[in-house]
């Protein structure tokens, strides 16, 4: 088990698995609050925001980027969190490949000179959460800007070789499996019976 036994996260996870109620309050290194108590500052200071649904993830990413951080450009910016969405086994740094679910931040200052191929690609430097710098990555801007319902088609397009990334202020719990974060926020959502145990 990754979390220490006295961890509030372990305690809360155990209660959730057993179907026991979870009340608002502090649990050692974790706290449970209502959605209306979540502040912009809490969201800004979190390493990641975990959501159960893509729709919520997209909403939170847009909220963080446009409303809280006031980022106006349609392109990723310096220090902005991204997550890789398609494996590229040909790119490796320190034994780590650029794979689906790899999260990190943009480490260069992308400008107009980094955009190419009719505004469909952008060159970025990507620093993953393990401190591995992937330099000069050709990012697929068409995929990055596409609505969720078009992304799967773009991912499977054999003619588009650029690497697929999405915003990652918030990610789904599915993509976070195996990851560790010091300061995360989990947004509880109703899931269909066939998803929950």
What function would you assign to each model-found segment?
Residues 32-45:
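Conserved interdomain hinge at the start of the Helicase C-terminal
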Residues 12-16, 41, 63:
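Residues that form generic nucleotide/phosphate-binding pockets
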Residues 4-7, 48-197:
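Core RecA-like ATPase module of SF1/SF2 helicases and allied nucleic-acid translocases
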């Amino acid at each position: 088990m990754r979390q220490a036994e006295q961890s509030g996260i372990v305690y809360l996870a155990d209660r959730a698995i057993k179907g026991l109620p979870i009340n608002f309050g502090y649990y050692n290194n974790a706290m449970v609050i209502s959605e209306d108590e979540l502040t912009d500052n809490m969201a800004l200071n979190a390493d990641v925001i975990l959501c159960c649904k893509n729709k919520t993830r997209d909403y939170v990413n847009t909220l963080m980027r446009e409303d809280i951080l006031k980022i106006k450009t349609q392109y990723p910016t310096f220090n902005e969190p991204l997550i890789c969405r398609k494996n590229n086994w040909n790119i490796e740094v320190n034994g780590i490949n650029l794979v689906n679910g790899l999260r990190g931040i943009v480490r260069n200052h992308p400008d107009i000179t980094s955009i190419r191929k009719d505004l469909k690609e952008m060159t970025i430097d990507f620093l993953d959460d393990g401190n591995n710098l992937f330099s000069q990555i050709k990012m697929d801007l068409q995929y990055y800007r596409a609505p969720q319902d078009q992304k799967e088609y773009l991912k499977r397009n054999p003619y588009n070789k650029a690497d697929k990334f999405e915003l990652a202020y918030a990610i789904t719990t599915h993509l976070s499996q195996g990851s560790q974060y010091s300061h995360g926020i989990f947004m509880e959502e109703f899931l269909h019976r066939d998803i929950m145990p």
